[in-house]
A protein has these predicted regions:
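Acidic, metal-coordinating catalytic segment for phosphate/diphosphate chemistry
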Residues: 1-19
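Conserved Nudix-box catalytic region and its N-terminal flanking loop in Nudix hydrolases
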Residues: 23-62
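Active-site beta-strand termini and strand-to-loop segments that position acidic
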Residues: 22-25, 99-101
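Short connector loops at helix/strand junctions that flank enzyme active sites
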Residues: 15-17, 23, 34-36, 41, ...
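Unchanged
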Residues: 46-70, 78-133
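Class I (Rossmann-like) S-adenosyl-L-methionine-dependent methyltransferase catalytic domain
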Residues: 5-10, 77-84, 91, 134, ...
Length: 144
């Protein structure tokens, strides 16, 4: 079982991931990985010595090809349970952000095959027990 929780803040050193919910012209932005037939929002691991908001910007640019965007932190989230990126099941923390993308690169240079703009949320999620809850929390907060 996977549990997702939300926090206003935690100690910075606990933040290991950044996940970015994105929209462009009123549509949801999702990535399709080259090795999967599912969709996900952009995100990834924090590099050593990296500011967590810089992690979010880097992952957004790498995975979506975003060139022009505005990004804002929403909250801290945690995931407890074994997942594709956590084989121990211990609670891990990340920064959840929102980005409005106004310009994309013509080509992607990452593990992502393509970026898709959707009116509705996808049915085939890469992380179905996590990412829908992150988006639901963003929508409930009505911040952006």
């Amino acid at each position: 079982m996977v549990e997702v929780k939300f926090y206003d803040t935690v100690n910075d050193e606990l933040l290991k991931f950044a996940v970015i919910i994105s929209q462009s012209n009123g549509k949801w932005v999702f990535c399709k990985h080259k090795e999967r037939d599912t969709y996900e929002v952009s995100g990834g691991h924090r590099e050593a010595g990296e500011d967590i908001l810089e992690t979010a910007k880097r992952e957004l640019q790498e995975e979506t090809g975003a060139i022009k965007f505005e990004i804002k932190p929403i909250c801290v989230y945690s995931v407890t349970g074994k997942t594709r990126v956590n084989d121990t099941g211990e609670e891990t923390f990340g920064l959840l952000c929102f980005a409005e993308i106004t310009e994309f690169a013509k080509e992607l240079h990452s593990e992502m095959e393509k970026v898709v703009l959707m009116d509705e949320l996808p049915e085939n999620w890469t992380y179905p027990l996590i990412q829908p809850k992150l988006i639901e929390n963003k929508e409930n907060l009505k911040l952006y």
